[in-house]
Amino acid sequence: MAVPKRRVSHSRSAKRRTHYKITLAKPVKDKDGTYKLPHHINPTTGEYK
């Protein structure tokens, strides 16, 4: 069974976790010029993009 030989410091574990982040969805410009979230239906035109 694998057991760590030394304690991992807070800064080292935080450096490893820097890539665990949430990316926000960027709005997409629709044909009528409004911005909306991707994979959603535009209520005015009814377009799904």
Curated annotation (Swiss-Prot):
Family of this protein: Belongs to the bacterial ribosomal protein bL32 family.
Record region (Disordered): 25-49
GO biological process per UniProt: translation
Name of a matching Pfam family: Ribosomal_L32p
HAMAP family the record matches: Ribosomal_bL32
Keyword Ribosomal protein: yes
GO CC annotation: large ribosomal subunit
Record's keyword annotation contains Ribosomal protein: yes
Alphabetical keyword list: Ribonucleoprotein, Ribosomal protein
InterPro entries with a match to the protein in the record: Ribosomal_bL32, Ribosomal_bL32_bact, Ribosomal_zn-bd
Top-rank taxon: Bacteria
GO molecular function: structural constituent of ribosome
Official protein name in the record: Large ribosomal subunit protein bL32
